[in-house]
Regions:
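A glycine/proline-hinged amphipathic helix-loop "lid/cap" segment
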Residues: 1-73
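Alpha/beta-hydrolase superfamily serine-hydrolase fold, recognizing
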Residues: 11, 58-211
């Protein structure tokens, strides 16, 4: 029979072993842990950054996709902006973008919808664009807005999503939004444009398009 000291030591090292086992993950899972940490950090932005006074949010479902509706006292219920968030199609969420979009709603007078579209690596492209199309069409078919009332756009990957969603709608002969905008769009994911190399070699690195 083990002594009290031995039992205590066994219990202590058993806990340590459990912690070590939890930390050691398969190489294929390491990237996923990194992505989850990035998502957590992104969402913290929504809790830290200041929001516009009087802003409010409502969670609903559009085309089966969790979506936030963001308004301020300046928001016109007849002027709709569908915002696709950035994040390299891997991170980003309504939670993380909420502060920024409250200010955008205040300054533009739009009522903003931001979908929590599917992300990689759990969902391969073009799942993201499919969600972009679904949310736009749901604004029309489920909430009764006319295409002329709706503009959509986004930043980075959201800018790419805006352009591709527009092309998908056009190719299918679907209704189009009244306007589309892109903020620093990730328009060349494969980095095939000459400007990437030319800018990086001939100018200050921080002025190149990669930044």
């Amino acid at each position: 029979m083990l002594s009290k000291e031995a039992m205590k030591a066994k219990k202590k090292y058993s806990k340590l072993g459990s912690i070590i086992s939890w930390l050691v993950v398969h190489p294929k899972k390491i990237k996923m842990w990194k992505v989850k940490l990035q998502r957590l950090n992104f969402n913290l932005i929504g809790k830290i950054n200041p929001k516009s006074d009087g802003a409010s949010k409502e969670e609903l479902t559009l085309g089966g996709i969790r979506t936030w509706k963001i308004t301020t006292p300046n928001s016109d219920p007849e002027k709709i902006l569908l915002y696709y968030h950035g994040g390299a199609y891997q991170v980003g969420s309504p939670e993380g973008y909420y502060p920024m979009l409250t200010h955008l709603a205040r300054e533009t007078g739009f009522t903003i919808y931001i979908p929590d579209y599917r992300l990689a690596p759990e969902h391969y492209y073009p799942a993201q664009v499919e969600d972009g199309v679904k949310t736009f069409e749901a604004l029309i078919n489920e909430l009764g807005y006319s295409p002329g009332q709706i503009a959509f756009g986004g930043d980075s990957a959201g800018g790419n999503m805006s352009l591709v969603t527009l092309l998908k709608l056009k190719d299918k002969g679907k209704s189009l939004p009244s306007a589309v905008f892109c903020i620093s769009p990730w328009a060349d994911p494969a980095a095939t444009g000459e400007s990437y190399n030319d800018e990086m070699c001939s100018k200050d690195l921080l002025l190149g398009p990669i930044f």
